[in-house]
Amino acid sequence: MTKLTARQQQVFDLIRRAIERSGFPPTRAEIAAELGFSSPNAAEEHLRALARKGVIELAAGASRGIRLLGIDDMPHQFTLPHAGLMQLSLPLVGRVAAGSPILAQEHISQHYACDPALFTSKPDYLLKVRGLSMRDAGILDGDLLAVQKRTEAKDGQIIVARLGDDVTVKRLMRRPGGIELIAENPDYENIFVKAGSAEFALEGIAVGLIRSGEL
């Protein structure tokens, strides 16, 4: 890797940890808060320096448009969208009624026009997060989680799943005899689901996050 200053290495390592933990990079404001910078502008300066050194790629105008370069063991990374792509129109899913599809018309409260560069891969919908069970992964109450519909997910990915009558956001880990849905907050218990349980259905994986007020 290109030689980095100590501060640049801190920023790079923070980005890597965030992607490993949640599947998407931090915002400038989150970098500034974590590393004690005076403002997000200071974080932006370090990001531009890292981009000039060829260790990250930045997508213009996207608060989470950061990709690490030259890293082979980052399974959650995707190619950043090219500038100039048309905006995506994404449905926002509110509360989901038991037994009905998550994208049923009655669950969609509105549509948002979103820049594709906000996301690591093309999402199918936005889900409003309720609660703080994923707080330590940077996912807070009221955030909009970008979700790509999937029927399979890898260990460690953050997923949206239907569990009985509820829809939940958790980290997926396979265990002997089933799967564990892991909360990223010690105040919440993990959930073990037995293999073949009719109560469980995977709805999709997280491919981005929009903080409340960013749209």
Curated annotation (Swiss-Prot):
One Pfam assignment: Peptidase_S24
Catalyzed reactions per annotation: Hydrolysis of Ala-|-Gly bond in repressor LexA
Highest taxon, organism lineage: Bacteria
Enzyme Commission number(s) from the entry: 3.4.21.88
The protein's enzyme class: hydrolase
This protein's record includes keyword Transcription regulation: yes
Family: Belongs to the peptidase S24 family.
Subunit text: Homodimer.
HAMAP family reported for this sequence: LexA
Name of the molecule in the record: LexA repressor
Organism: Burkholderia vietnamiensis (strain G4 / LMG 22486) (Burkholderia cepacia (strain R1808))
Name of the coding gene: lexA
